[in-house]
Design a protein with these regions (language model features):
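Glycine-rich beta->alpha junctions and the first turn(s) of the following alpha-helix
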Residues: 115-190
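A structural signal for short hydrophobic beta-strand segments in well-ordered beta-sheet cores
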Residues: 60-63
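A short core secondary-structure module
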Residues: 72-118
Length: 190
């Protein structure tokens, strides 16, 4: 059993659901059908180098700029970092002290000027891939903000409750397949 085969579907469902529920109707209408058909991949820009288990302790900044926002910072250990066409990127828009208040989310086309990406040599999730994405004053239009400004963390992260349970089931499935293969080998060996 290959964990990656089901993980790819889980990420598509999670990210497509986030965009359908929290992005503008125009973005959802353009991108969700492409996610469903498998023509595009949307990544999740949440984890940062110093964040660890405190996912809301974000350093990536979003500052008002013209009729939009300018993103500066880094996301790391991001699934599909070097493959995704777009990403839901969480950034600090206020409350520099930290915490989930002051965190907003943006739908970002990862082909925009000022974005660079790296790939991690990862033995566990090669088909999915992981890496870092760097944002160097990347302009994002105001209409690409998802959910409510400064309060996106809680509302969007609620989608993870279901996906976390699915990841646990995926792990159990891979473990069961390993036990089954081992048992079959033990039964047949001489």
């Amino acid at each position: 059993a290959d964990f990656n085969a089901s993980y790819i579907q889980l990420l598509g469902s999670l990210m497509g659901g986030m965009v359908a529920k929290h992005a503008s109707s125009e973005i959802a209408a353009e991108w969700v059908p492409k996610v469903i058909s498998g023509d595009v991949v949307i990544g999740l820009g949440l984890t940062e180098p110093r964040g660890g288990s405190d996912a809301a302790n974000l350093q990536l900044k979003a500052e008002k700029f013209g009729n939009g926002w300018r993103l500066s910072g880094e996301k790391t250990s991001m699934s599909f970092a070097d493959q995704a066409d777009a990403a839901v990127v969480f950034a600090r828009t206020s409350n520099p002290e930290g915490g989930s208040r002051g965190v907003s989310a943006f739908f970002v086309d990862l082909t925009e000027k000022g974005i660079s990406r790296t790939h991690f040599d990862d033995i566990g999730t090669k088909p999915v891939g992981r890496g870092s994405v760097f944002f160097d004053d990347v302009y994002v239009p105001a209409e690409n903000m998802m959910a409510e400004q400064d309060r996106a963390f809680g509302s969007i992260m609620a989608g993870f409750d279901f996906s976390r349970a699915l990841i646990g089931l995926e792990c159990l499935g891979a473990a069961q397949a390993s036990v089954d293969e081992t048992w079959a080998y033990v039964q047949d060996r001489e």
